[in-house]
């Protein structure tokens, strides 16, 4: 900027990052609503949003400018993961409408090459399909390719540029995977307890940010990856769990050549001989300021009836678009469902699942995760947090679950519900409906010992026969209680003992078995 001033070049700077505490660059104007004292109410504009405001001010006709550039503002706002609330939400909604009806040639070509139906474009489509392809060019040092795509009016040139960007994105994915594997090798299988700070002279500067995001999610910690060049390095930083990266870097700035960004993502420059000091200082700051607890997945609805996931119901959720950061799609969950099939897709980067909920089957996809790291296996039970979406493939329309979190099912809560006669939980126990052999085995156990079910779920489960699922054992006890084979003063399995009734009990006619058979 000093050189620009010396040669008489007038420069206007637009930005949306934190300004820090250093002196602002010498320019005709610095436009950033995060400057101290700036009165503009929306502090979460994307960089493209700030540029739009400048264009509106220069043109004097905001409506005209927005009509011309709403599509680019939408793409940039979603790509930069800005909160989709308030003004940002309105801007993206306006841009999606333009993208769906009259996209510029470059974006239209990109949507064709990405197999995106423009009439069904959503903010999520931008975030997961369009934005990565556009960003790939800049990450690999060819930003002009993306710029040309967005500016061209020639449909043929647009197609050629879109093909080139898709190829660059494939290269970016391969480089990212290599970096991620190398980063894990540096960690040597250890589980760090402070922000991850890794460095290498083998990594690609434009891709380390994506790898850092993946590491942050994998280890539930902030991650910083530094690309070394001689005795200096440039790093990309990604937060996790609400930890404010910008404030952390500011607190450790004595070890840095410079830094910038915001709470969730930042960049830095560092001398190689300061790396260890910086890592130690950041660890100390993290331990003193780390979030009180890791963020939990907050689900809006527990699905226990597959009819809730009908195509019509899922399509109705689209009326609330655009979804995104700070305005996510409704999160739903299923618990204790059968995991019928597992397969890796996308060269092993993603996990496809087929689950069974009562009598219905659903396909699910979990991006950037594997069955091994999650500890999942076919035939097991799983809890999933997900957003439902419509999937159309070869003329077939179905509901697909886009998984946000997965874990092996812990049957203790289900067992507790069965023992306490909570019929609202029986749907999740259909997999464990006992057969005659199960009933015989449990009854013989009861008869051959002075059986008492115990006063807690833990005491009951401690008596489960070896090799039998705890849920199946609990159902057997609940059925025996319903038929009178067991008696209990409190009406639940807790404290139940053998009742010594005369005659045979019809186990299959019990309400519990009837409900389980219909699940």
Q: Can you say where each PLM-predicted feature lies in the sequence?
A:
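Short gly/pro/ser/thr-enriched loop/turn and capping motifs at secondary-structure boundaries
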Residues: 17-22, 29, 37-39, 230-233, ...
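Alpha-helical scaffold elements adjacent to nucleotide-binding pockets in ATP/GTP-utilizing enzyme cores
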Residues: 3, 50-54, 91-94, 277, ...
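Generic detector of well-ordered alpha-helical packing
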Residues: 16-17, 33, 81, 136
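Hydrophobic helix-and-loop "lid/oligomerization" segment in the mid-to-C-terminal part
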Residues: 7, 59-277, 345
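N-terminal small/polar loop signature for handling phosphorylated ligands or for N-terminal nucleophile
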Residues: 1-24, 30-32, 178-186, 216
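Mid-to-C-terminal polyanion-binding domains and interfaces
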Residues: 157-161, 168-199, 251-519
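Short alpha-helices
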Residues: 24-78
